[in-house]
Structure formats: structure tokens, C-alpha cells
Amino acid sequence: MKRRHRQPGNAWQRYLARLRGLGIPLPGRSSSRRPATRADEQRLYDAPPSFADMLPWVEYLPDSQSLLLEDGQSVAAFFELSTIGTEGREAEWLQEVRDALENTLQDSFEERDQQPWVVQLYAQDETDWGPYLQNLRNYVHPRAQGSAFTEFYLNTISQHLQAISKPGGLFEDTTVSHLPWRGQQRRTRLVVYRRVRGEPLRHERSPEVALKVVCERLAGGLAHAGIQARRMEGNAIHDWLLRWFNPAPNWLGSDSTSRQRFYELARLPKPSELAELELTTTTDFAQRLFFRQPCSDTEHGVWWLDGLPHRVIVLDRLRSPPEIGHLTGENSRGADALNAVFDQLPESTVLCLTVIITPQDQLEAQLNHLGRKSVGDTLDSQQTREDVEQARSLIGRSHKLYRGALAFYLRDHTLEDLDARGLQLANALLNAGLQPVREEDEVAPLNSYLRWLPCVFDPERDKRQWYTQLLFAQHAANLAPVWGRSEGTGHPGITLFNRGGGLITFDPLNRLDRQMNAHLFLFGPTGSGKSATLNYLLNQITAIYRPRLFIVEAGNSFGLFADFAQSLGLSVHRIKLAPGAGVSLAPFADACRLVESPGQVSTLDTHALDDEESGDRLDERDVLGELEITARLMITGGEDKEEHRLTRADRSLIRQSILDAAHRCDDQQRPVLTEDVRDALRAIGNDESQPESRRIRLLEMADAMDLFCHGCDEELFNRDGTPWPEADVTLVDLGTYAREGYSAQLSIAYISLINAVNNIAERDQMLGRPIINVTDEGHIITKNPLLAPYVVKITKMWRKLGAWFWLATQNLDDLPKTAEPMLNMIEWWICLSMPPDEVQKISRFRALAPTQRSLMRSACKEAGKYSEGVILSKSLELLFRAVPPSLYLAMAMTEPEEKHQRHRLMQEQGVSELAAALQVAAEMDQTRGIRQRAPIKTRGS
């Protein structure tokens, strides 16, 4: 076959024709541009300006807990600070703390002519609840971990925190701040560094050692001012800045859950445990913070990070001397508003206060030069000379003068929204006496944004001091964002909120938080939210510790709590004290101890309990004294006039009768009943050797006790005790005995209940499981003068048994004078919002300092939104705001209208009361604007 030869040009033309036929552009240059040059090739290797290269952070040094800067010598330390609670504080107290803070700034740093120390304070509101939720989960006692009740609580609190931190806030606070209230944590961070030039002199410390010395002084001074400084590790620094420069990552999705997952995945990797070499690239600390290239916008003066515009607004000058806590402290605003300037700033604002520790001789020389230049008789010259003399005078009185700057970082989704936030910020600052630089007057806004980032500012390069201004150390202390709202101890046994939406955590059951005991007194007038608060506290403590709860109540305020606990796997035992209920309390059952341990029988006078010194010596139970109180209640019926008739001789005979009954019943091997003590009294009364008057008195007392041996009272007080089953929650409804006319029966029943709890505490004291005896409506129970001394007697040693006495009341008027030792014994006081006259009533039972009175008077309540209160203990003194999840509010509703709402749902839908309460909670979520989540499922619903 003959091969056919084709010309190469024909093949190329056919190739081009085929491409044209398919609509594909022809290959090759389609323009007449010049060929590439060597210069064009070189530009391939040129790097564009880098945002990250302007940041000085190179490497975290774990040995010195410092961040190495770009010069390879300078190091910086990062701290996270607690804040000083300013709510309800008096001016004198605030001034003392401010002076301590001022002294810390003045005394912690060495003043250097070259390379001075720089202090930067940053404050911002964050809604990242991850660290708290992880801390809460880790804090749960092993006994409660994994239980249905605990997991339900952890999920509920997580959903609640996410719901209340929505943009715009959960509600408008029209009573206190007149601003939206939003769940958020105000985080305050401190950065300390000094730029080093050249090699240190022979007598100088190395940069790391010098930083360590300064940080130790600074932390000690802050602690003296009541501020805890916690050193930030590399991961914590990285997490903070990662969120700053990546505010809206969408690599894994655009929702909050996806963003949180991104932050977790992008965390600084842990050092390898194996002996492997580090990577040769991408280990720069600053480079690891960026997952998108920042873009500069010189036209609008913003940086675009993650597609969001960022801007900084710098303070031009102070128009008036700042007050204590000027920016972040709670102060009066206008007629009746009480808030902080920072509360009024736009969301996502970051405050930065920079202070340069300037030598005083340099500043004095500058002042002298300024004074010499102010010549002439013009008004400006005279004013300048006066200001210079005043400044020199203040420096001479140990008020140091430094240089400083104040900046505010803003961000939003669009330029228009960012401009609106800038206007909002400027208005808030101007109203507070702070004049910001107008955005259009900022010469180099992109540089300013970089300048006030951590560790970027170098005082040596600011030769003309254009970017800082003179600032007294006292004014810096007033402006510092360490003023704020209380945060508690950090132990999340109980979690509440403050007025700014931040968390308050404390734990009476944690021995690090208590100094004496975990006994608790909760007082709240009618309508203050006492039932809801106590319900919320019990839910939290039960979820964290799974204690044994004994709840004594009148009015079924905790019936739904018991149903809820039972639906989640806790065992519940209910007792109702009413005729025909089949309950027997056996008030003299402990009399057998008098025979078993006769050497331990105490004969102390009950009145001696008013003496604190004698009370402190009571390391063992006074069983005989306790039983005497029970017998006296039966004899006198709880009536004051009958109690006054009792003489010391009568009391001695009562004790003798109890001992006689105990010995007789021990011989018969049976428990002591009320009738046995009655018979012992009659036996002594029938003794012919006794004086006639004594015999008559004894028979009268026996007849009085006989009332408890017949009729309805016999079933409850004159039978063998009914054994209590093992249960997580024991709910005792006082029923009939909570009414008027049953004072004696109520007191005796309560004593018997406390005895039963005490016996369980003694039996299980080695198991390590706490017991909490909760008494609601305490004013009904403790109004009997004999009962409070008894409670002091028996609960004095509960600290050793791990049992705690919690008392709640809404009425202080019914508490007798004898209740004072009982209330003084209690370390933890929670006082809900109350009128001024109630504060005065509290002072009857507890000495209140002026600061504590001021705190109590400042607590408020807004129906349907929140209730406030004050926590007082040996280690805490703070104001809190209760904003519980809707579920816990629904379980504590005791008003008639609220009960009717549940009853209507039960009738309409044929569900249990607990299921009706869960539905009420869902309706409350809708009213509060909380997004509906998956239905709450319990066994009872």
C-alpha cells in the first residue's frame, strides 16, 4: 500500500479549523503586547506587603512563660485579670482600692531613660462559653458524672448560655442600666513588655529575668488591690488573637457551631512528646494566626479581616479628670440609669489602654521647658504656667506622670454598619468626657490599627511623642478596665450572672470557698423570687454533687422539683405530716443514747448557747438537752406564758424523767415513746417524798404531755418511728401543722425530722456524700423561741459530718431573738432584693458594714426578666442577677395564676403537672425570644 504524505502546514490548519468549529479560542498571543522582560521575571519573586510581618510575635517560650518578639531579645508577658466589682460600692471603698492600684503602677516598674517598660490593658466582651462549659463538666463530682440529671443540667445550661448571648441581648433592662442585657463575659488582659536594644550591660539582668521580676511585683500589687492575675500560656494567647484576626471563618460553615469547630481545630498544636524536629517553616507565632490574607482599604481607612471591615478610633484628649472605674466600672448615668461606659459601646468593641513607664526627671524637664516657653500675659500663657505648676506639685506628692494612649477597635459586617458603630462609640465617649479623634482627621488609620496591637508600639521610635499624651498614674488607674462587676470564686458549684451578663460562680460546698461551714440562709421578701432562686440553686447543687436532699416545706413549692428529679433517675421519698398519713416521728427515739453512753450525757444549760465561747466547745451532741426541748414544747404547747412558768427545778425534773424513761425502756428493749416520759413524770409526781407544790407541778406537766398521747397527735408522736427509705430526695410537706394553732406540734415534728437527718448523717459520715437539709418558709418553723437553740445544738457539729443546714424565709419579723445564734452560725447569706426597712431588719441578726448595706439597697428586680440579690460570706461580698433557664422558672411558679395555667394545660391535654410545666417553659422561651430547641424529654412527660 502506498503511504500518503501530508504537509505539516496542512495539519496545523486543520487543527485550528477544528478548534474554531468547536468555538474554542485559538492558542497563542492574541495581543500585540511586548514580550516579557527580565524585570517582569524578577517581579515573580517579589513579596507584597504583609500584615503579619508587621506583628512582632515570633515564638512562645514555655520556660519563661513569655512571648519572644521579632528582635530575638525582647520578651512580653500576657496575663488575664479578674475585675473589681463596683456594684453598690461606696466611694470610700473604691478610693482605697484605686490607691492600691495606683501604687502598683508606680512601684512595680523600674524607670528607664532608654527602652522604657510598656503596659497594655485590653478589655472586650466575649460570648465564647466553651472554657466555662468544659470547666463545669470537669467540676462535676465523680458521683454525679454521667447521670441523666447531670447531663440534662449541662445541656440545659449550655443551651441557655447560647440563647442569652444572642446579638441585641435577651431583654431591655429598664430598671437599672436602661440598656440591653446580654449574656457575655468581659475579659480583661494585661500585656507587659520592654524593647531591648543591643547586649545588656554586665550589671543588668537578662530580658527574661527582668520580665519575671517585674511580673512578680505586678502580680503581688494587683493581688493587694483585689485583682487576680493569671499568666496566659501560649495556647491562651493564640486563642485570643486567633479570634481577633479570624472573626468570621467559613471554612467549615458559617454558623456558630462551625466557627467554634474551626477555632478548636486551628488551635496552637501541642509540642510533640516524641523527639522530633520542628518544622523549618510556618512556626512563626504571628503567621499561624492568619488563614486569609488581610486586605488594606486606604480609601475608607479600614482593614478587611475575614471579609469584615475593622477600624481603630484613638482618643484625642481627656476633657475632664476621669472618675474611678470611668470606662468599665458601674456609675450613675443621668437621673436613674446605672451602667458602665463600656456597656454603651457597640458589640465586639475592644478597648486598649497603653501606659509607658516614663522617668519622672524627663517629664519634669519637659514641664520646666514648657513653663519657660509660656511667656507673656495672654490667657493661654497664664493657663499653661498654672497647669505646669499644678503638675509639678502633683508629681511632688507621689502622683507620677506617665505617657499613655487609649484606643478602641471596632468591626462590623459592612462599611455602613461600621460607620454607625463609630458614631455610637463617639457619642458614648463624648458623654463620658472623652474626646476621640474624628475618623476623617486620622492621618494614617491603617498604621494606627497596627500600632496599638499587643507589643507593637515602640516608644523609642515615637521620637516626637505624637502618639501618646501625658497621663497621671491615678488617671490611668481610673481608666484601667480592671473595674467591672463581680465574678465570684471560679468554682462553678453555683452559677449566676452579674449586671453585665458575665458569670458569677461560687460553691459553698467547696472548702476552698468556705471558711466556717456551708450552712446557708436565703432571705427574700414576697415577690422577690425566693422560690425560683432556691429551686435553681438546688438543681445546680444536685447536678454537681448529687447530695442527699431533705426538703421541709409548706405549700408544695418543691413538688415539681421532686417530680423532675424522679423523672431523671433520682429516687424520691415523700412524707406528708397530716392525720391519717401513717407517719410516725418518735421524738424521743434518741433517748436510748443516754443509756448506751452515760458518760457523754451533757447537762449544759440551753440558755448558755447564746454565748459563742460555750457554743464553740460543743463538739458532741447534747442529746439530753435536745430531748428536754422536745418535752418542754409538749408541756408548754409553744406558748410564751407557759414557757415563762418553767423554773430551773422544773427543767431538772423533766431531764430526770427522760433519763428514767430511757432506763425503763432499755430494760424492756424497746424505744422510748412520749407516753414513757409522761409516765415518768407522773411517777415522780406521785412520790410522797416530793413537796406538795412540786408534785402538783409534775402532774400538770404530765397531763400536758398526755395531749400528745391521744387523738391525731398520737399517731405522729407516740409510736415507734417510721423508717425512712434510702432516697436521693426526701420531700417533707408539713401539711396541717403549718397552719395557725399547731405551733407545738410543728416544732416537735421539725425537731424529730432534724433528728432523723442527723442519724443518717452520723451513719454515713465516712461515705463522703454531702447532706443538705433545706427548710423553706423558715419563719413558720423557727418562730418558736425554743427551736432556734435546738437547731444550733444539733447542727453545730454537722460540719464534721458533711451535713449542711439551709434555711429560706420571706419574713424576718417572725424570727425570735433566740434565732440570732442560729443565724450567726450560718456563713452563707443570700439576700434578694428588698426595701430599705428589710435591710434594717437584717441588721438585727447580722452586723452589716456600710458597704454591705449599700449592696443590699442597690439590688433590684424586674418582673419577667431578672431578680437581684447579694451574697455575703467570709470570703465573698457581691451582687448577683438571677436569670435562670425557663424550665427552672416554670418548676418554681407558685402564684395562683401560674398554678391555674398548669392546671388548664393538664385538663386540656391530659398530661401530668410536670409535663404541663415543661410546656409552660417552652412558652416562656417564646416570650423571651429564645429559639426553640428539641423538646425536653423526661420519664414523666
Pin down the residues of each PLM region.
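Extended, folded cores of ATP/NTP-driven motor/assembly subunits in large transport
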Residues: 2-473, 480
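Hydrophobic alpha-helical scaffolding
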Residues: 44, 204, 208, 381, ...
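P-loop NTPase motor domains
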Residues: 97-100, 105-107, 340-343, 446-504, ...
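Anion (oxyanion) recognition and catalysis
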Residues: 223, 430, 542-543, 799
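Conserved P-loop NTPase motor cores
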Residues: 502, 508-540, 549-552, 556-558, ...
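Short, structured coil segments at secondary-structure junctions
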Residues: 545, 568-570, 825
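Conserved P-loop NTPase
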Residues: 850-905
